[in-house]
């Protein structure tokens, strides 16, 4: 196509159009010209060069116009070419549209023709299916017999042959299904149950792996091979995966748990120890059998020993959890279970045996018992043991109380001391329970140790209560006790034995002071026994002191001789008491006698009639003091701890011949005995019988005005326990002398 023809085909451009930039360019040019012109007019010397500027601008304008024309011409040519190409494309699109319309019509005609051929197509498909069936018909006729034969092989436990036969039938089913377009023939309906029967046979063989490994390893190998081969097979049929490998592994685990932890094997009441002992023997043997017999029958990736160990551990853990959820265990079963779980199971006799390889390690698995389980078992064990310990201790105490009423004196040991097996029984009960728990855990030992101390404190309180009842019944005459005091002294030996031996209940880990409550109860018991003994002594001495002082007392030593005889006879039983309790008894007995002596003096039964009687009373008191001092020295009481010197001090008060010096004597008496009161001094002055009112007031004022006595270490109360005017029982048990 030449240029003339092309120009005819191109559409004409519309005229009268302007560039949008033209007006702005013109404004800029005018502005630049005005700016230049204003500069020229401001500088007249430049006017001479105006012609040159005009020529230069004319040339520049011509050059710009030429360039603009060239650009515009090029632009117009490109626009014409583009318009022409659009026109050509429009013609091509219209042609393609017409061709597509014709093709659509042809397709519509072909679809109508194809519908008429659909019956023919169906006949062709049926023909192909019939052709395939005709070719497979001999094999299809043999399917029922093959299914029956396969079932026979399964029943005969010929698993590999049964699996081969099953796979042949399944392959025939696939070959038949493809040409039939997925159509399932009724002849293959028995393959599903047949495959399930074979799977169950594989599971049954795996579940009895331990027994088969010993008796028929070939069957176990066949079952495992069937499961492994089937895991690698694929099928074109849309069937759910059989997953016989996982079923085989689950059967291995379930069979193993059933053998050792089946419901029928659960321990009954009192059978836990026997059951755990059987497991101690059976589980290592099972692992050894798995390593020696089962592992060679299985692929390496089965990790038979690890599978066995983990399965046994998990089954045992679940079994123990079920056991804890059932009826509460007895203390013997609880102790056995704790010791077995914490020491035997992981010990060298079982899972920690060096004969087992690292695959049998179960230390990284969940423990058989959680911390909560262990705490619960320990609490249960301690509660049950505490109940039995309390029962045993009460039974021992009841037996001891019965012994107190015997007609014979208490038994003595080879050294002649009163003796009873009660302290040894008590400590043995407690110490054995603590010692036994040491083989389980420190926490259990701590719990039982705390329980033992608590029960020992309770036992001591019960012992004290029993003593009080025993004494009350005896004093009221409700019970005849031939040897009341000897049995009281025997209980004091019991207290000493417990005090000296209670340290065996203190393990090394116990912090100091943990035995303080028990020691406090023992101290209370000792004081109570001493008080009861002294009350018995008072009951014998009070009738004698009722006649002191008197005219008979002034003239004869018989009254005090009777006191000394009864005291000596009473204290003879002290020789059967062990030290240091015997010293405590002697101190308190001597102090009790002195207190009774002082109480008798304060009652005002005697008033001296003159100087001779005062001298006689002073000599009698000096003689009595010497007699009492000699008595208790003979019994083994040191002179330094005796209270008898108070009688010598009172003797000076009576023996004073000048009543005006009573203030000095009273002041000295107060320095020696700070607890002496005005009532005591007044009663002693009444005994003199020669003190006037003024002299009495002067003596009492010296008692009040005198310097405060200096405190002395170990000084014990004396006059503060002497009532005026009426006597009463009094006793105290702090340590220290009266002097």
Swiss-Prot record:
One of its GO terms (biological process) is exocytosis. It is found in: Cytoplasmic vesicle, Secretory vesicle. Pfam families: Sec6. One of its GO terms (cellular component) is exocyst. Residues 1-370 are annotated as: Mediates interaction with EXOC2, EXOC4 and EXOC5. Keywords: Cytoplasmic vesicle, Exocytosis. Its main location: cytoplasm. One of its GO terms (molecular function) is SNARE binding. InterPro entries: EXOC3/Sec6, EXOC3/Sec6_C. Belongs to the SEC6 family. Interacts with EXOC2, EXOC4 and EXOC5; may be part of the exocyst. PANTHER family: EXOCYST COMPLEX COMPONENT 3-LIKE PROTEIN (PTHR21292:SF12), EXOCYST COMPLEX COMPONENT SEC6-RELATED (PTHR21292). As part of the exocyst, may play a role in regulated exocytosis of insulin granules. This is Exocyst complex component 3-like protein. The gene is EXOC3L1.
């Amino acid at each position: 196509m030449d240029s003339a023809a092309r120009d005819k085909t191109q559409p004409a451009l519309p005229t009268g159009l302007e560039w949008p930039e033209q007006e702005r360019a013109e404004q800029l040019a005018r502005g630049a010209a005005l700016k230049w012109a204003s500069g020229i007019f401001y500088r007249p010397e430049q006017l001479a060069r105006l012609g040159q500027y005009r020529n230069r601008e004319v040339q520049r304008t011509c050059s710009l116009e030429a360039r603009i024309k060239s650009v515009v011409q090029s632009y117009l040519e490109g626009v014409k070419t583009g318009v022409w190409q659009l026109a050509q494309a429009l013609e091509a699109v219209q042609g393609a549209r017409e061709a597509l319309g014709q093709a659509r019509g042809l397709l519509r005609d072909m679809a109508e023709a194809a519908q008429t051929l659909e019956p023919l197509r169906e006949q062709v498909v049926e023909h192909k299916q019939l052709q395939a069936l005709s070719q497979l018909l001999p094999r299809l006729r043999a399917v029922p017999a093959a299914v029956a034969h396969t079932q026979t092989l399964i029943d005969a436990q010929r698993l590999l042959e049964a699996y081969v036969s099953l796979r042949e039938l399944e392959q025939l089913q696939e070959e038949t299904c493809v040409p039939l377009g997925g159509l399932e023939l009724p002849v293959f309906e028995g393959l599903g149950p047949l495959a399930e029967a074979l799977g169950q046979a594989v599971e049954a063989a795996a579940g009895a792996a331990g027994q088969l490994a010993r008796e028929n390893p070939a069957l176990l190998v066949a079952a495992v091979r069937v499961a492994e081969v089937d895991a690698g097979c694929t099928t074109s049929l849309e069937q759910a995966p059989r997953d016989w490998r996982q079923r085989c592994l689950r059967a291995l685990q379930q069979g193993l748990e059933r053998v050792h932890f089946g419901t029928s094997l659960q321990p009954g009441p009192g059978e836990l120890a026997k059951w755990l002992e059987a497991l101690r023997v059976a589980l290592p043997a099972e692992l050894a059998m798995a390593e020696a017999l089962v592992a060679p029958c299985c692929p390496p990736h089965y990790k038979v020993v690890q599978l066995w160990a983990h399965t046994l551990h998990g089954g045992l853990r679940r079994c123990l959890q079920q056991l804890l959820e059932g009826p509460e265990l007895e203390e013997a079963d609880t102790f056995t279970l704790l010791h077995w779980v914490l020491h035997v199971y992981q010990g060298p006799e079982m899972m920690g045996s060096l004969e087992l390889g690292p695959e049998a390690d179960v230390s990284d698995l969940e423990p058989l018992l959680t911390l909560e389980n262990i705490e619960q078992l320990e609490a249960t064990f301690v509660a049950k043991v505490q109940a039995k310990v309390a029962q045993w201790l009460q039974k021992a105490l009841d037996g001891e109380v019965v012994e107190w009423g015997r007609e014979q004196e208490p038994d003595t040991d080879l050294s002649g001391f009163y003796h009873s097996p009660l302290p040894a029984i008590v400590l043995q009960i407690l110490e054995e329970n603590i010692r036994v728990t040491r083989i389980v855990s420190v926490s259990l030992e701590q719990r039982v140790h705390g329980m033992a101390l608590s029960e020992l404190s309770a036992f001591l309180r019960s012992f004290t209560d029993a003593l009080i009842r025993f004494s009350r019944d005896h004093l009221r005459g409700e019970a005849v006790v031939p040897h009341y005091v000897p049995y009281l002294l025997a209980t004091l030996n019991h207290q000493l034995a417990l005090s000296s031996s209670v340290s065996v209940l203190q393990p090394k880990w116990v912090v100091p002071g943990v035995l303080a409550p028990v020691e406090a109860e023992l101290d209370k018991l000792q004081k109570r026994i001493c008080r009861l003994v002294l009350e018995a002594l008072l009951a014998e001495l009070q009738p004698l002191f009722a006649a002191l002082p008197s005219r008979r007392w002034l003239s004869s030593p018989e009254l005090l001789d009777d006191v000394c005889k009864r005291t000596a006879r009473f204290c003879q039983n002290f020789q059967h008491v062990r030290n240091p309790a015997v010293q405590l008894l002697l101190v308190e007995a001597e102090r009790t006698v002195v207190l009774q002596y002082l109480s008798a003096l304060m009652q005002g039964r005697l008033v001296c009639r003159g100087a001779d009687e005062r001298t006689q009373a002073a000599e009698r008191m000096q003689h009595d003091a010497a007699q009492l001092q000699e008595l208790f020295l003979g019994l083994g009481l040191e002179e330094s701890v005796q209270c008898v010197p108070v009688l010598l001090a009172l003797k000076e008060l009576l023996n004073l011949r000048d009543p005006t010096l009573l203030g000095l004597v009273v002041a000295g008496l107060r320095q020696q005995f700070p607890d002496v009161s005005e009532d005591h001094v007044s009663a002693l002055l009444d005994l003199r019988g020669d003190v006037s009112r003024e002299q009495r007031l002067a003596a009492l004022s010296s008692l009040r005005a005198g310097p405060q006595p200096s405190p002395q270490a170990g000084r014990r109360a004396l006059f503060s326990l002497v009532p005026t005017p009426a006597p009463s029982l009094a006793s105290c048990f702090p340590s220290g002398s009266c002097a």
